[in-house]
Curated annotation (Swiss-Prot):
Upper taxonomic lineage: Eukaryota, Metazoa, Chordata, Craniata, Vertebrata
BP GO annotations: cell aggregation; cell-cell adhesion via plasma-membrane adhesion molecules; cell-cell junction maintenance; myelination
UniProt feature, compositional bias: Basic and acidic residues: 224-248
Record bears the keyword Nucleus: no
Complex formation: Homodimer and homotetramer.
Its job: Is an adhesion molecule necessary for normal myelination in the peripheral nervous system. It mediates adhesion between adjacent myelin wraps and ultimately drives myelin compaction.
Residues bearing PTM Phosphoserine: S210, S226, S228, S233, S237, S243
Name of protein: Myelin protein P0
Annotated glycan sites: N122
Alphabetized Gene3D superfamilies for the sequence: Immunoglobulins
CDD domains (alphabetical): IgV_P0
GO CC terms in record: plasma membrane
Organism: Mus musculus (Mouse)
Length: 248
């Protein structure tokens, strides 16, 4: 290499980007979803839901496969298969004529219904989906429990308890605000009554003051008149006394 010529090796930033795109980016794979547990009563029916996510468009070659492993068993057997737009139901096994296809691949739905449940149906059901070219991914499992009478789920009980507590809290809050409203209303009425009483007292005091103001000159006039009458009477009496002396 000639002195001063630029290096032909890739820059560290470009190498890091290439490494992250090839190594660090996760590979996309199909993801299948089912319930974890489902409960049913003897003689009833249950729906085993199965859906999926795929990075590819729904292919015409999409397939769904359901397998069943009995409770306490080791091996799983195929009980249902969907491919090329057609459902294939087991015709010789324990679920003969009891499985119904209710899925719709266009909506990424591979659900089935099991009719006329029995205690022997207890076990694990596995849903497997292939959507070529997206065929790599994990299956999903749902466990079926069959009872004579379906028990109340813990979540339902918990929800009922929480709902009851919230109802009581709301009732207490409503009662608190109602009592507070009545108390404030009563205080306002009492305040209005006190204000009216104060105004009445003020008006009465003003009237009394004005009445006393009007009565004062009259009293003074009456007093002056009384004094004048008394003086005149005394003067008259004195004059009569002097006239009597003169006659003697």
């Amino acid at each position: 290499m000639a002195p001063g010529a630029p290096s032909s090796s890739p820059s560290p930033i470009l190498a890091a980007l290439l490494f992250s795109s090839l190594v660090l980016s996760p590979a996309l794979a199909i993801v299948v979803y089912t319930d974890r547990e489902i409960y049913g009563a003897v003689g009833s029916q249950v729906t085993l839901h199965c859906s999926f996510w795929s990075s590819e468009w729904v292919s015409d070659d999409i397939s769904f496969t359901w397998r069943y492993q009995p409770e306490g068993g080791r091996d799983a057997i195929s009980i249902f298969h969907y491919a090329k737009g057609q459902p294939y139901i087991d015709e010789v096994g324990a679920f003969k004529e009891r499985i119904q296809w209710v899925g719709d691949p266009r909506w990424k739905d591979g659900s089935i219904v099991i009719h006329n449940l029995d205690y022997s149906d207890n076990g694990t059901f596995t849903c497997d989906v292939k959507n070529p070219p997206d065929i790599v991914g994990k299956t999903s499992q749902v466990t079926l429990y069959v009872f004579e009478k379906v028990p109340t789920r813990y979540g339902v009980v918990l929800g009922a308890v929480i709902g009851g507590i919230l109802g009581v809290v709301l009732l207490l809050l409503l009662l608190f605000y109602l009592i507070r409203y009545c108390w404030l209303r009563r205080q306002a009425a009492l305040q209005r009554r006190l204000s009216a009483m104060e105004k009445g007292r003020f008006h009465k005091s003003s009237k009394d003051s004005s009445k006393r103001g009007r009565q004062t000159p009259v009293l003074y006039a009456m007093l002056d008149h009384s004094r004048s009458t008394k003086a005149a009477s005394e003067k008259k009496s004195k004059g009569l006394g002097e006239s009597r002396k003169d006659k003697k």
